UniProtKB/Swiss-Prot annotation:
Designated gene of the protein: LIG4
Cofactor field: Mg(2+)
Listed EC numbers: 6.5.1.1
Sequence positions that bind Mg(2+) 2: E452
Gene Ontology terms: biological process: DNA biosynthetic process; DNA recombination; double-strand break repair via classical nonhomologous end joining; nucleotide-excision repair, DNA gap filling
Active site: K297 (n6-amp-lysine intermediate)
Residues binding Mg(2+) 1: E357
The name this protein goes by in its record: DNA ligase 4
Stretch list, region Disordered: 1-20, 825-928
Taxonomy, superkingdom: Eukaryota
Gene Ontology terms for molecular function: ATP binding; DNA binding; DNA ligase (ATP) activity; metal ion binding
Comp. bias regions, Basic and acidic residues: 834-864, 886-900
Amino acid sequence: MAVHAPYNHAPPPTQEINGQKPTLAPAITLERPADCINRGQYPAFYIICGYLNRLRADAPHKKYELLTRIFGNWREKVGPDLYPLIRLLLPDKDRERPVYNLKESMLARCYIDILSLEKHSEAAQRLIKWKQPAGNSPNPTGDFAKVCYNEIKARSTVEEGQLSVEAVNMLLDKLAVGKMKQKDYVPILKAINMQCTAEEQEWIIRIILKDLHISIRERGVLSAFHPDAIDLYNVCSDLKRVCWTLYDPGFRLNKNETHLELFHSFLPQLCGRMNDASLENIAKAIGAPKEFIMEEKLDGERIQLHMRGNGAQWFYCSRKAKDYTYLYGAHPGEGSLTRYIATAFQDNVRNVILDGEMMVWDPVVERYLAFGTLKSAALAFSLVKVFDILFLNDHCLSRKRLSERKRLLRSGKIFKNIENYKGRLEFVDEKRGKNAKDIREYLERVVETKGEGLVVKKTDVIYQTNSRGYDWIKVKPEYSDQMGENLEVLVLGGWWGKGGRSGKISRLLCGLREQAFDDGTLQDFLFNRFWNELLGLRVDFVSHLMHLRSMRCSPTHLSQCRNKHKKHWRPFDRSNPPPFMKLGPVGLDDKPDVYIEPENSFVIEVKASEIVPAGYGIGFTLRFPRCKYIYYDKNSRDYALDDECLWTVGQGFFYKTRKLIKRTDFMDLFSRPKRSYDDSQGPGNFRGQKLSDADVETSIFSDMTFSDLEALVHKHGADFTQAQLSDLSAIVISPDQKNPLVRAQIRHGVNVIKPEWVFESIARRTALPFLKEFLVFASEEAQDGRYYNKTLEQYDKVSFVRDRTGGALVDEDGDADVEDEIMDGEDKDEIDVEESRESKNRRMAREDLKEKESNRTLEQKKLQEAWGLRSRASPGDSDSEPEEEMSLKEESDTDSERSRGLRAIYEDEEDGENDSHESDVGVNGDDYRAVPLSGLNDKEEGLMGESPEAMHYDEDRIFYHLAFYIDTAKNAAVNGLESSSPSFDTQERLVKVEKLLIENGGRVARSISDPKLTHIIMDDEDSRRYVELTRKTAMPKRKHIVTPKWVEDCVDEETLLDEDLYKPK
């Protein structure tokens, strides 16, 4: 059993070893087919920029058509070799230009030189400090390429780019020749600056940084290029090979042509992680009571080991195709590993591919070190732990069942006495299981020896390259409430985000106070940091909490919830840190961008896998932290390392001597809330924050309910919820009529009030009536109220000026002594509505596209028209493009190339940065629901929906994790249901809905017995099969039965709405 040292998980070694550093595995020397030669003229680079602008601005379902259009035009006008184009669309997958050694800081210095900027000028500082918010400045921040675009545009005299695609590729090749200094880069970038417009340079910078920000990756691009392209890429990771092998769109590969090959890196199979990670559900998903395999999960780097020539040649690469052969040894007697294991294989093993985990072994204490922590350790104590065999003696084994591959691996036919290679070559510890009890027992055994966790695998499945799913599921201790570490810490600083989080705090620095002196005064704070980006917090709440925009309230009653921390964040001076901070001896990158005084801050409770030694002020840090709760009603003095919260170090872990009180989840702040019902309090996933047992000071809100400002109204007797219940009197929100939740409630006639109403009521110690000025939306009942049309000043005079008997001096219906003052506008400091990140990015991209298109010359417009870029009446407006007409049959055919292409576009998501045996799908804080209205019940419907990796909400594919059955007469006949004769209007509505579902990522099922089925669409005018469908689809989980209106409203609102409001009549 593995014994893990308590070190931080570190990325694979990227430092230079003997003058070398890891790069993408080099492309195998290929010979270009004779008829794969471009004979036409390469297009101007601004044509490609035009396509990139469109890809960034378009919705996902339109990207596929755009890609097929550009590929078709290229083949027609240039030739069959699309490699020069595709390498620009996928710069991070280009093996021939693996690294530029150019990051934002170096590019900023280069452009300061190229643009002749004074180093301390505002323009130069904008380039250097591109992440920092610009305040009221219109200049963008957080997107380095866009910041450069604005500075270049203000100074460039180039009106029309002079470079072709071929010329741009040649210049990029020069930048990627090797590690150079600034003086070497400047002449090349200066040549680009003199021949390219600001727009073209923006895209070249994005290519250099290997992130185009177009929300599409290899799956989408290659699926549009050729139907077999992604299958071939999965087993070779080589764009050139894909382009030169599949240059003919009519050519199709045989199955044996997508097998794994020796010395070709491939994209390995990865683990999925269930959202409801109870051991019972994991066991069920993995096939229990059938036998499954449990392997110990290791803290290393996923590695592919290739050997051929009976041990003469060796090749090592990571799961992201980084070549580490130079480190571990290409031939016997070389490297830190090959020299020790060259004789481990049986004599009859000519060639082999093994899948495993690279570890660092300390033979002195006989334990594993966190991989990549020490360069010398990586050189001296490399160990590969093998868990799979995928190729043997010229035969690919990936299509063999896992149980067969495991049997072969451990049969003694592959290795000689493997026990003799302990510390260099070993099998992964594994055990067979049949139920949740077996998983629990093995997990406890692993945890007792400080192991990482488990990976459970089905035994009867083949090896699927570049896939995640429930065939392999990881089980980590911290996913269980009984395991891991929970603690409450004070937020003390943060780092500015970039990209979609520009202008916002994306990472937090947290800490604890040292033990108090005897006289009760406080010592310095000790600080810990969270490298992760607020895991578990919805992004919209991060915006509310820390962004420089927040809710609006009256000038006289500033609230805790409006601009709560806008004035509290202060720039952090690295040379003169705040006196209350005690930071460790770490590099400048570990100092925050901003800090906040403890008395102005707030407390968060985090859960982490463990607490490990680190170089920070407290001497320790958290591993895999995730935010669970946020508290505003706690004092910073409570978070000290004193006798009441004593920490001791033992075996590399911390153990708290006091028990934490478990609190009700603050689920409205978290991504993917789970449904749990409490008859007395309403749906648990919509309850507000859990407050401490503070005394209730008044009862002025005892009959009201609020969804925001919980801490404030709690003191005055109110309850709060995040769900709309039948007995609610109001919903307290920011004045935002565009919020989908708000619009949904407005449609149901619910009063929507502004936060000001709360503050003014508290100031008067009475609940104000619903005045017009405090209502975002007023129901008919509210509009009929006695005081609805009165101003607050009028109401004050009516209600609060009374004689000794308590009677009003001014008649309640009169206005004799009242000045009739009506508000004629919103407060000047009202904020913009916070948009979803993706929607905002697309909107800004469309605006940017319109601006750029308006500056095109006549010649450019003609050339764009020839390349299919000016087919729209309104360029850049994705809503103005006519929808492609196609039959329902064609649109719903999941086997069609277009359907597969659209699916690939939707599946294009960023992989995690961790090159490990695990997959962190579902952990990242970016996976969030825009509005916690409804969704799959994780506990009840965790196995329903399209696929495990689709269980994460995305606003561009809101139905992607769902599967739908449409209750048409035709489908009813197929499924043996009661027949009907619906009207033409009913049929037309259902056809329209099916098209909407597919365009927005949903899957349409024809059978009611489909195991992934989640929803049934039924029209009000043809609902006779409601009871029959309810009964026949009740097992194993009941399905949502909704009308077509639910689909239409979800698409309009760009989020999933509550199904209960759309049941058929």
